Amino acid sequence: MAPTQSKVKIHNLAEAHEKVLRAFPIEVEQNSEGNKLLVKQIRIRTLGHADHSNDSICFLNTYGFIKEAVSQTEFMRAGQRPESKNTLTACMLPFGPGPNIGSPQKMLEYAEDIKIHVRKTAGCKEQIVFSLDRTPQVFRGFQFPRDRYVCVPSDKYIKSPGKLVAGPNYCYTITFLSLTFCPSSQKFKVPRPILNFRSTRMRGIHLEIIMKITCSENSPIRKTLITDDPENGPKASVWIHLCNLYKGRNPIKVYDEAYFAEKCKQMLLSVGISDLWGPTIAVHANGKIPKSASLYFNSRGWALHPIADASPTMAKQLWSIGCEIIEVNAILQGSDYSALVDHPDVIYRKIRIDPAKKQYAHSKWNPFKKAISMPDLTGISI
């Protein structure tokens, strides 16, 4: 018989971060030639006390589409624009943290000059390589332009990687820019080796984030969500690994569930969501962090967890739909797998949720609609 569960709830969100995450609407206009054009947009958010001072940084995230690149050998008449290729699939590409931008509104027009190549490769998994060929000066201070390329699992940033085949050259065209200003003290993404570490001497603490999802009744996404409460709408559960706690060797001291639950309470955890490396869970420990958990937070008690790392499918759904964090639970489990299967979960339900920063609003742009119900984008220039 499987072990039973108990949990600890967290009541409100991390200050300076939202419990609502907003997505972009889609707008189409016609040019003088009568062709449909997808309106490019920029979203600017400021978190906490971030401003244009030296203490603030800026996260840049981009959303757009992948299409076949224009051939280098095509012939064109004078004044003729290159023929636009058909859009293959939607894509998100985070540029990461960078300097504080004084005039972010100008970045939208410079985004047209960015040239990004997209190629498939393979290791233990199918992978996608994004490489920069041309970058305007205003973007060069961000992480991705500094590195010049990034290699990720194919399902992490691309909606339908199966549409990319060997042979053609593909490019990524930016349609939406998302800039988030935040204090530099909040910049800390937990290294992957630390997140993957397991030990028999440890107990693992995970966070379960319950989100209310905003989508229409006929949306195909509803089939992947929890729909047992029609009055409150569909929900989704996302888990992230928060930290490990050392069991201890003192033979007299009792290291039971109550002991570890008390450790959770002492950390005074709070949770929010923002668009940083894509939709990102922000965790703030306002209280005492155990020594064994200190590697999972920066010196100010912050830790950022991109949903694209924890649940790529859920992250891609949040490109086009809204969400609101309604509940956060801390889960205590055995760290190594043998302890995990032999002991029940302990669940702590008192995690704070920032009421001002808990939602991701609904978007009219939905790259997940079936072709028969999707607006005709074949004639749209991107």
Curated annotation (Swiss-Prot):
Cellular localization per UniProt: Virion
- Highest taxon listed in the record's lineage: Viruses
Instruction: Please verify whether the record's keywords include Repressor.
Output: no
Range of residues in the leader sequence: none
The UniProt GO MF terms for this protein read: structural constituent of virion
Q: Does the keyword Disulfide bond apply?
A: no
Q: Name the keywords, alphabetized.
A: Viral envelope protein, Viral matrix protein, Virion
Name the GO cellular-component terms. Answer: viral envelope
Which family does the record claim for this protein?
Belongs to the morbillivirus/respirovirus/rubulavirus M protein family.
Full protein name: Matrix protein
